[in-house]
């Protein structure tokens, strides 16, 4: 439940940077709010095979289901598709001398990771997501 200082407009969660800093761990804040990337093979969900739903660590928005998760060997949790297409936004990212597609939470605009066209079927996509941006709700 949002606190009194959290604004929700058109299903968007808007908080001050001070609120985000209070509510998120340092690594969650760095990833979700500052677009950082956790070190490969360091995230808690990279090798987690439990069944469940992955939600945004910032706002609880449903993002990915465990049945879409696969081991890509890249060092981050990878998914073939979002649980609900409209729950993620994509933006062109030209940082670090690369052209990539950034994946963001559609509800709080938190940085999740990137999507690449080199995944397995059925989509051929690899959503490469930072563990720090996620919380697993086990089934």
From Swiss-Prot:
- Give the cofactor note: Binds 1 zinc ion per subunit. The zinc ion is important for the structural integrity of the protein.
- Keyword set for this entry? Metal-binding, Oxidoreductase, Zinc
**Which parts of the sequence belong to the MsrB domain?**
17-139
What Pfam family is a match for this entry? Answer: SelR
GO BP term, example: protein repair
Signal sequence residues: none
What GO CC terms are in its UniProt record? cytoplasm
Q: Which cofactors go with this protein?
A: Zn(2+)
Query: Which Gene Ontology molecular function entries are recorded, alphabetically?
Result: peptide-methionine (R)-S-oxide reductase activity; zinc ion binding
Q: What is its EC number?
A: 1.8.4.12
Claim: Lyase is one of the keywords in the record:
no
- What residues sit in the active site? 128 (nucleophile)
Residues the entry annotates as binding Zn(2+): 56, 59, 105, 108
Q: Which InterPro entries does the record associate with it?
A: Met_Sox_Rdtase_MsrB (IPR028427), Met_Sox_Rdtase_MsrB_dom (IPR002579), Mss4-like_sf (IPR011057)
- Report if keyword Oxidoreductase is assigned: yes
Show the catalytic activity.
L-methionyl-[protein] + [thioredoxin]-disulfide + H2O = L-methionyl-(R)-S-oxide-[protein] + [thioredoxin]-dithiol
Which protein family is named in the record? Belongs to the MsrB Met sulfoxide reductase family.
Q: List the NCBIfam families hit by this protein, alphabetically.
A: peptide-methionine (R)-S-oxide reductase MsrB
- State the protein's name: Peptide methionine sulfoxide reductase MsrB
Q: Which organism is it from?
A: Bradyrhizobium diazoefficiens (strain JCM 10833 / BCRC 13528 / IAM 13628 / NBRC 14792 / USDA 110)
Its taxonomic path starts at: Bacteria, Pseudomonadati, Pseudomonadota, Alphaproteobacteria, Hyphomicrobiales
């Amino acid at each position: 439940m949002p606190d009194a200082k959290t604004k929700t407009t058109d299903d968007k969660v808007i908080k001050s940077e001070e609120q985000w800093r209070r509510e998120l761990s340092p690594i969650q804040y760095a990833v979700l709010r500052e677009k950082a990337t956790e070190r490969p093979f360091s995230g808690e969900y990279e090798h987690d095979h439990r069944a469940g739903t992955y939600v945004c660590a910032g706002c609880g928005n449903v993002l990915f289901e465990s049945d879409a998760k696969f081991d890509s060997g890249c060092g981050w949790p990878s998914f073939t598709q979002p649980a609900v297409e409209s729950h993620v936004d994509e933006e062109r990212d030209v940082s670090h001398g690369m052209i990539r597609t950034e994946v963001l939470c559609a509800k709080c605009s938190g940085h999740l990771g990137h999507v690449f066209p080199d995944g397995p079927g059925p989509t051929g996509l690899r959503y490469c997501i930072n563990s720090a941006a996620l919380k697993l709700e086990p089934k």
